[in-house]
A protein has these predicted regions:
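C-terminal motif of bacterial Sec signal peptides marking the signal peptidase cleavage site
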Residues: 33-35
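N-terminal secretory signal peptides that target proteins for export/translocation
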Residues: 1-15
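Residues within mature, well-folded domains
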Residues: 37-183
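Sec-dependent N-terminal signal peptides
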Residues: 14-27
Length: 183
């Protein structure tokens, strides 16, 4: 990305401001639309076989086995996106559900003191970031999402040494707001 900006700045000298603005707009659109392909795809219908799901959605980032013989396919939007889709395939090899899981409603289903890292992975997929809180020796998984469909937020899931969720804290996503960036 830095290389492209350096090149654009050098081009400005030769092209002038209007041409540079057009170049910046075209670069911005191509980068932003490239990340939207997952959002623009129509999900396969419920009951579709696994092969059709993968043909339509592509190779999942991860596959999680379920105790009943089914599986959950993770179609990632993290680390930069605010959406993460999970396709649940039943033991019969057919699509049961396909949903965007990074929502306040879905986060509310996590059981403090009972949910495990495996539960969180199967429910939400891989986090955008991981960190540690030394005071409690917690591992923290952070997920970007749109709180109430509006606010750029992060949900921080705190695990104890046994991998059990001890607390969840949401707040503004510093990636989208300079006031909350660490300096």
């Amino acid at each position: 990305m830095t290389h492209l900006l350096d090149k654009a700045l050098r081009v400005r000298v030769r092209l002038g401001a209007p041409a540079l603005a057009a170049l910046a707009l075209s670069l911005s659109l191509s980068l932003s639309l490239g990340g939207c392909t997952q959002l623009l795809r129509q999900p396969p219908p419920a009951g579709a076989p696994l092969a059709e799901v993968q043909a339509k959605l592509g190779t999942p980032r991860a596959v999680y086995r379920l105790p009943d013989g089914g599986q959950v396919l993770e179609y990632a939007g993290q680390p930069m996106g605010q959406f993460q889709h999970m396709a649940t395939i039943g033991a019969d090899g057919r699509l049961v559900s396909y949903e965007q899981v990074l929502t306040s409603e879905k986060f509310a289903t996590v059981k403090i003191g009972r949910s495990t890292k495996d539960d969180i992975l199967r429910t939400f997929g891989h986090p955008a970031e991981t960190s540690r809180v030394a005071f409690h020796n917690y591992e923290v998984w952070s997920y970007r999402y749109k709180e109430a469909g509006v606010w750029n937020s992060m949900m921080h899931v705190h695990f104890d040494e046994g991998g059990i969720v001890q607390q969840m804290i949401n707040g503004p996503d510093p990636m989208y707001d300079d006031r909350f960036r660490f300096r």
